[in-house]
């Protein structure tokens, strides 16, 4: 009797690594998760130990096997999805990182980004990469490491150092250095990749003085990149055949294959992506133009709005302010709040993302009175996530010249019913929550399975992930607009405060 075959997805996130085993129906068979250390060397800096990330991935692969009883030789293929932009530079010969991984959230390279802006490169970078010049993307992070690690520039020029985002690092480790590759979706987030010409941009590399020899080969999102070295996969030699940055993987996992489809993942940050099809649309309103995915010889573009603080605002309530013991508790407190929504929290802890791109803004609270309770504060924090999503959806509709009818949602905070209902109310459109909230991992699994024939085609995938629950708007128009107007005032005041000179 032939053994049943499965697909494993490795989901390497900002705060934890996970391995999930899926069956042919797209159902989760088992999963394992491990958190790792967040390193904050200075205010606004965020780093990870890349070796610790690799160890956590090894650990969760084992955990998924142990929990399910599935053996390594039953895994047909592996899909990888990852926190994007986070930057690793390592020694080609020893495999050891020369510095910590600089995380997407980290602002330590903001002065470099400002310097590029002041040199007049904003338009050039936008046209080539689809991105706004910001410390968020990998380009300035690579430059920072080459500047701050002694001898790094020289070694990079000699071809002794390699650069990669987390996907590249994991494939390199899993294949024992046999494959130094990335995919379209991750390359598009480096600010070094020309998304129109689909190649590393020589002019940008020259401006930043980043040696091309460091860069990985860019491949499609669904093909075999290499096989696991048996000693790194518990004896199994398994093809790694699907790869996408976490948000693009979620777009694919949400089956948003048609132009105009939009998804939002409520994770650490919140990321809204619209599939715009095979045409690259440059945003005129500070959204990012990026690559959604490339499969079967075609590349599908996307518009994206990035919110830096979403689920992490709830973590802040839990860990920083100790107002809740766990994240789900925030829903109960929000429902117990009886104020008139006059409190606004602007969680600009690491600046404001799209459409403001204000890296100097910091968190603020408005509208407090003597009667404000803990419940009100928690509710306002949840509402801030929904308001930020509205900022982006409004902008996206202008850029894409289309009305969005429904927003597909997933991610941890999408489990919060209060937040989902308020999101529907403040947007005035339906919110469709995926039945399987593991859409990021599922997207990576789908991409891996397609390339080895585990699933036949997109039509077969369409039968695998249904909508779980629909939230319909119930707030009247004038109330909705009054609340949103208050939010816009709060953001304006937050930005003004950051601009006041000492």
Swiss-Prot record:
Glycerol binds at residues 84-85, 136, 246-247. ADP binds at residues 14, 18, 268, 311, 412, 416. InterPro entries: ATPase_NBD (IPR043129), Carb_kinase_FGGY (IPR000577), Carb_kinase_FGGY_CS (IPR018483), FGGY_C (IPR018485), FGGY_N (IPR018484), Glycerol_kin (IPR005999). ATP binds at residues 14-16, 268, 311, 315, 412. The phosphoenolpyruvate-dependent sugar phosphotransferase system (PTS), including enzyme I, and histidine-containing protein (HPr) are required for the phosphorylation, which leads to the activation of the enzyme. Keywords: ATP-binding, Glycerol metabolism, Kinase, Nucleotide-binding, Phosphoprotein, Transferase. Sn-glycerol 3-phosphate binds at residues 14, 84-85, 136, 246. It holds the Pfam family FGGY_C. The modification Phosphohistidine is found at residue 232. Pathway: Polyol metabolism; glycerol degradation via glycerol kinase pathway; sn-glycerol 3-phosphate from glycerol: step 1/1. One of its GO terms (biological process) is glycerol-3-phosphate metabolic process. GO terms for cellular component: cytosol. It catalyses: glycerol + ATP = sn-glycerol 3-phosphate + ADP + H(+). Transmembrane segments: none annotated. Its EC number is 2.7.1.30. Activated by phosphorylation and inhibited by fructose 1,6-bisphosphate (FBP). GO terms for molecular function: ATP binding; glycerol kinase activity. HAMAP family: Glycerol_kin. PANTHER family: GLYCEROL KINASE, SUGAR KINASE. Homotetramer and homodimer (in equilibrium). Belongs to the FGGY kinase family. Key enzyme in the regulation of glycerol uptake and metabolism. Catalyzes the phosphorylation of glycerol to yield sn-glycerol 3-phosphate. This is Glycerol kinase.
């Amino acid at each position: 009797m032939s053994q049943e075959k499965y697909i494993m997805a490795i989901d390497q996130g900002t705060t934890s690594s996970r391995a999930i085993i899926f069956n042919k129906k797209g159902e989760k068979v088992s999963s394992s998760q491990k958190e790792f250390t967040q390193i904050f060397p200075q205010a606004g800096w965020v780093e990870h130990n890349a070796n610790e990330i690799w160890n956590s991935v090894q650990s969760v692969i084992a955990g998924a096997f142990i929990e399910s009883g599935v053996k390594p030789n039953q895994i047909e293929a592996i899909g990888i999805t990852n926190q994007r932009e986070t930057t690793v530079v390592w020694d080609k010969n020893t495999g050891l990182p020369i510095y910590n991984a600089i995380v997407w959230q980290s602002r330590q390279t903001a002065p470099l980004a400002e310097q590029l802006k002041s040199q007049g490169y904003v338009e050039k970078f936008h046209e080539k990469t689809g991105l706004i010049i910001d410390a968020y993307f990998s380009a300035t992070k690579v430059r920072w490491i080459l500047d701050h690690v002694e001898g790094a520039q020289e070694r990079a020029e000699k071809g002794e150092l390699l650069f990669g985002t987390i996907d590249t690092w994991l494939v390199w480790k899993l294949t024992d250095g046999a494959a130094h590759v990335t995919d379209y979706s991750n390359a598009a987030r480096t600010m070094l990749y020309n998304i129109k010409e689909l190649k590393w941009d020589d002019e940008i590399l020259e401006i930043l003085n980043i040696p091309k020899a460091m860069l990985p080969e860019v491949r499609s999102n669904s093909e075999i990149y290499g096989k696991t070295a048996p000693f790194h996969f518990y004896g199994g030699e398994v093809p790694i055949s699907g790869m996408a940055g976490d948000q693009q993987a979620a777009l694919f996992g949400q089956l948003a294959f048609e132009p105009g489809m939009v998804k939002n993942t409520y994770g650490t940050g919140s990321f809204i992506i619209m599939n715009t099809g095979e045409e690259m649309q440059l945003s005129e309103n500070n959204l990012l133009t990026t690559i959604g995915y490339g499969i079967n010889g075609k590349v599908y573009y996307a518009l994206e709005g990035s919110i830096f603080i979403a689920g992490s605002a709830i973590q802040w309530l839990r860990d920083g302010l100790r107002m809740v013991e766990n994240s789900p508790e925030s829903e109960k407190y929000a429902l117990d709040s009886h104020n008139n929504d006059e409190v606004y929290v602007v969680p600009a802890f690491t600046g404001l993302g799209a459409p403001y791109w204000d890296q100097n803004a910091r968190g603020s609270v408005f509208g407090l009175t003597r009667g404000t309770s803990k419940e009100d504060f928690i509710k306002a924090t949840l509402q801030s996530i929904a308001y930020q999503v509205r900022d982006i959806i409004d902008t996206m509709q202008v850029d894409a010249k289309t009305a969005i009818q429904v927003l597909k949602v997933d991610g941890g905070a999408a489990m919060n019913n209060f937040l989902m209902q308020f999101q529907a109310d403040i947007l005035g459109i339906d919110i469709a929550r995926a039945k399987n909230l593991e859409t990021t991992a599922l997207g990576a699994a789908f991409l891996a399975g397609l390339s080895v024939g585990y699933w036949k085609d997109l039509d077969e995938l369409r039968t695998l992930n249904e909508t779980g629950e629909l939230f319909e708007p119930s707030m009247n128009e004038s109330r909705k607009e009054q609340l949103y107007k208050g939010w816009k005032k709060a953001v304006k005041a937050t930005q003004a405060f950051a601009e006041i000179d000492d």
